[in-house]
Amino acid sequence: MAVLLHSLDLPAKMFRPWTDSWIAPLDGFQVPAGAQKPAVWKAAFGVMAAPPPKDTAVFLHSDLLPVNMLWSRGRITGLTDWNSIHRGARAIDVGHCRRYLAALYSPEWSEQLRSLYESIAGVTLDPWWDLYALLHYDDSGPKWIRGQVAGRRPVDVPGMASRVEVAIETALRRLG
C-alpha cells in the first residue's frame, strides 16, 4: 500500500521536520524509561542535530500506521486519518509504520517492512528520515498504542521501548 500511495502525484505542502509533526523539538528528546541501551537513543538524537538530507518528495500520508489501515478478510482495503498529508521523504511514512511494528510485534518485522518496501519500490530509504520517524517513540507511546489497539491484540507494554530501540540501532548501522 505504501508504494502505491507514494506513487500518487497529488498536491500537498512540503513536510517541515520539527514543525509539521508532534515529535519532540530537537532539544526535547529524552531516553524512554524502558530503554535498555540509553547510548543508542543518545546517538540517534545526535544524528538529528544534522540538517535533514535532501530526498525525493513524494505524496505522504504522514500517519501511516497499522492502526490506520482498514482490513477485510486478511487484506488491507483502505486507509484512515488523512489530516496530516504532505510531500516529503518516503522514509517518513515507512518509518512511522516501522515504529509501530517494532513496538507491537518485533524489530524483525519492522526491518522486514523496510526491506520489502525498498525491494518493491526499487529505492533505498534514507536512514536519517527513518530515524526521524522512529524517534517519535517516547514515554507516551505505550499509552497511545494500547489505546489505538484497544484490546484487538495483546500488547506487551514493558517490551515496547527495547523493541523500538533495536529498530533505531539497526537504522544507525545503516547510516554508517
Language-model segments: residues:
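An alpha-helical support segment within catalytic cores of ATP-dependent transferases
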Residues: 7-62, 160-171, 175
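Active-site activation/catalytic loop segments of kinase-like enzymes and analogous catalytic loops
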Residues: 92-122, 134-152
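N-proximal accessory regions
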Residues: 59, 132-176
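Active-site-adjacent helix/loop segment of glycosyltransferases
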Residues: 123, 127-131
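Protein kinase-like catalytic domain
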Residues: 2, 6-10, 102, 121
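Active-site acidic catalytic loop and adjacent metal/ATP-binding pocket
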Residues: 46-92
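Signature tryptophan residues that serve as conserved aromatic anchors
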Residues: 41, 71, 82, 128-129
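Hydrophobic core positions within the conserved protein kinase catalytic domain
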Residues: 2-5, 48-49, 98
